[in-house]
């Protein structure tokens, strides 16, 4: 039986990063809403509990989310983060106040007290000998009086109690966020908590996960048939392979050609799954259906909802032809859930995803989401472990709504045709351009394989169609044609990202090819926005 960490979600948009950091340490973890019952907490069997951050204030009194009392009575270690620290302090007899100075962003925290959690962990030492941590803060309220039994563990000039510890009861708390990559020692802090404080072993790995997931799918589905929407993207492909391993021919994949796919996507999907993997795949031409419903629609949320709705309708029609079809499988992963406010709807919605939004209550199929608790890098690891080809597993993410969210404003077939050709040129040149590491830089990969080219070196790259025309010159005449934006980002977890510094020569070649080969486009621009403040997709 694996050791496991229970994470209670108070609504932070980065809660699942806590789970990722715990899993990076080889320890299994799960996220549940904060309002689970005391009985659930007692019966869960956690080796430790982590309380996430959140958008609320404990000063709101009875309206504020509270930690289940059983958490503090279990006798297992507890780590509170941001709101989790404030809730811990308030419920155990401390005091919380509105801060006069809100802290959002980088901060330098001084470690105090030589606690077991922070011992010998620091980024630098001051001339006075104080250990300092470079961290990420995001809070308004702060603890101004610690509960009985707690001692100071960390501080900043604006937040005198930035960390506290009751080592007798193994309770620790930080006002900063160790789960985000901006906190340089965050991974070490969480590893220290789960290994040294909670006593967990590194016994969670992908082969074990496959065995457990396969058994769970079999128990969940029984003898029913499952229908899965196969897009050719990483998530749906890995979900299909995992479910097929579990139930074989009980799985039918439905590949919907809605006119918003990448160039030659349909051919690739059919060859890979139907011909090579032996999966039952039904291809449906629904271009007219989707384009008809999207006509005249410009609002991004409305487009996503329409695309999600039409997917579901297609699946329902197909399910009606299969008497034993009871389940609709989707490749939903953690970032989808996070950005749609996820479990319990405790967070603030950023935008809805077709996988987790737009499903009508009249849906006659139950949802099967075997990847729902996995991050993108874990999905890729799973795909490799399942024997899928490397180039498929490490293909860039493609949104469920397809090019529908890469065409700004109204979606038209002509726009999609232009965009898919421009996008194919961009991806081809990224693959054809060798990646050269900048002098003095260190390479970081998510699969341990050195980057072969700029496609490997970027986490996601694509073209975006802008429904505006610009003046240009072609030969001896003036043109008035459309604009395409190129987007390429690098990220570890898709929660935050920075724009990729592609070589000018590469960008120039891509621009020249698109303008010369895709009639109807006369201008190419490059997006240099990070996430945040922008999202990776434009819509």
UniProtKB/Swiss-Prot annotation:
ATP binds at residues 231-237. InterPro entries: Class_I_gatase-like, GATASE, GMP_synth_C, GMP_synth_GATase, GMP_synthase, GMPS_ATP_PPase_dom, NAD/GMP_synthase, Rossmann-like_a/b/a_fold. Residues 4-203 form the Glutamine amidotransferase type-1 domain. Pfam families: GATase, GMP_synt_C, NAD_synthase. Residues 204-395 form the GMPS ATP-PPase domain. It catalyses: XMP + L-glutamine + ATP + H2O = GMP + L-glutamate + AMP + diphosphate + 2 H(+). CDD domains: GATase1_GMP_Synthase, GMP_synthase_C. SUPFAM superfamilies: Adenine nucleotide alpha hydrolases-like, Class I glutamine amidotransferase-like, GMP synthetase C-terminal dimerisation domain. Its EC number is 6.3.5.2. GO terms for molecular function: ATP binding; GMP synthase activity. Keywords: ATP-binding, Glutamine amidotransferase, GMP biosynthesis, Ligase, Nucleotide-binding, Purine biosynthesis. Pathway: Purine metabolism; GMP biosynthesis; GMP from XMP (L-Gln route): step 1/1. The active site is at 82 (nucleophile), 177, 179. It comes from the Bacteria. GO terms for cellular component: cytosol. Homodimer. Catalyzes the synthesis of GMP from XMP. PANTHER family: GMP SYNTHASE [GLUTAMINE-HYDROLYZING], GMP SYNTHASE-RELATED. This is GMP synthase [glutamine-hydrolyzing]. It comes from Herminiimonas arsenicoxydans.
């Amino acid at each position: 039986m694996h050791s496991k960490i229970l994470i209670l979600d108070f609504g932070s948009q980065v809660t699942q990063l806590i789970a990722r950091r715990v899993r990076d340490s080889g320890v299994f973890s799960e996220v549940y809403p904060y309002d689970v019952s005391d009985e659930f907490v007692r019966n869960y069997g956690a080796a430790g509990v982590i309380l996430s951050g959140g958008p609320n204030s404990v000063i709101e009194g009875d309206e504020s989310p509270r930690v289940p009392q059983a958490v503090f009575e279990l006798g297992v270690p507890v780590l509170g983060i941001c709101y989790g620290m404030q809730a811990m302090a308030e419920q155990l007899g401390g005091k919380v106040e509105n801060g006069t100075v809100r802290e959002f962003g980088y901060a330098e925290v001084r470690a105090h007290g030589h606690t077991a959690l922070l011992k010998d962990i620091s980024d630098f030492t001051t001339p006075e000998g104080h250990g300092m941590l470079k961290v990420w803060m995001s809070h308004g309220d702060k603890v101004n009086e610690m509960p009985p039994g707690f001692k100071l563990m960390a501080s900043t000039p604006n937040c005198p109690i930035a960390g506290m510890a009751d080592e007798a009861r193994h309770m620790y708390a930080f006002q900063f966020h160790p789960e985000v990559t901006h906190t340089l020692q965050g991974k070490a802090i969480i590893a220290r908590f789960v290994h040294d404080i909670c006593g967990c072993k590194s016994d969670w790995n992908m082969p074990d996960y496959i065995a457990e997931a396969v058994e769970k799918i079999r128990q969940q589905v029984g003898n029913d048939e499952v229908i899965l929407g196969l897009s050719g993207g990483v998530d749906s492909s890995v979900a299909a392979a995992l479910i097929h391993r579990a139930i074989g021919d009980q799985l039918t994949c439905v590949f919907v050609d809605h006119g918003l796919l990448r160039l030659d996507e349909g051919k690739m999907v059919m060859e890979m799954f139907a011909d090579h993997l032996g999966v039952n795949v039904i291809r449906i031409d629904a271009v007219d259906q989707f384009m008809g419903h999207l006509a005249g629609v410009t609002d991004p949320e409305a487009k996503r909802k329409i695309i999600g709705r039409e997917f579901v309708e297609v699946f329902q029609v197909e399910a009606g032809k299969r008497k034993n079809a009871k389940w609709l499988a989707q490749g939903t992963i953690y970032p989808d859930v996070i950005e749609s406010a996820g479990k319990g709807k405790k967070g603030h919605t950023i935008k809805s995803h077709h996988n987790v939004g737009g499903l009508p209550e009249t849906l006659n199929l139950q949802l099967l989401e075997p990847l729902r608790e996995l991050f993108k890098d874990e999905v890729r690891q799973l795909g490799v472990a399942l024997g899928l080809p490397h180039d498929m597993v490490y293909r860039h993410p493609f949104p469920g709504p397809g090019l529908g969210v890469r065409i700004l404003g109204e979606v038209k077939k002509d726009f999609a045709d232009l965009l898919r050709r421009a996008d194919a040129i961009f991806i081809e040149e990224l693959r054809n351009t060798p990646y050269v590491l900048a002098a003095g830089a260190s390479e970081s990969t998510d699969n341990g394989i050195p980057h072969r080219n700029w496609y490997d070196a970027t986490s996601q790259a694509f073209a975006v169609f802008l429904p505006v025309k610009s003046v240009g010159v072609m030969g001896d005449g003036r043109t008035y044609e459309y604009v395409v934006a190129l987007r390429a980002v690098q990220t570890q977890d898709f929660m935050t990202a920075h724009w990729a510094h592609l070589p000018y020569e590469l960008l120039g070649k891509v621009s020249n090819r698109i303008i010369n080969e895709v009639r109807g486009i006369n201008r190419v621009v490059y997006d240099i926005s990070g996430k945040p403040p922008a999202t990776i997709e434009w819509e």
